[in-house]
Amino acid sequence: MSFLANLFGAKNKYNDEQLVSQATKAVVADPLISDPTALVITSKKGVITLSGIVHKAQEKDRIEGVVRNSLKNAGLKHESFINELKLPHK
C-alpha cells in the first residue's frame, strides 16, 4: 500500500451496493430458487455473504452459481464469496 493509502485508509474498490443489488435481482429472477425472500445477501469490501435458509441442498450451490454468473455477466468484480446458506433443522 502507498503511504497515502496507509495514512488515509484504503478506498473500497468495490461497489458493495451495486454488488448486492445485482445479486439480489439475479436470485429473485431465477425460477428454480424456491424462496428468495428467505435469503440475505450482503457485501463488505467486495466480500459477498450469502445467508439464510434453503429448502434443498442443491439450492445452496445453485444460488451461489446464479450470483457469480450474474456479477460476471454484469462486469462487476468482487473479492470473494462466503456461502452461509443452511438447510432447515429437522
Give names to the regions the model predicted.
Residues M1-K90:
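N-terminal targeting leaders
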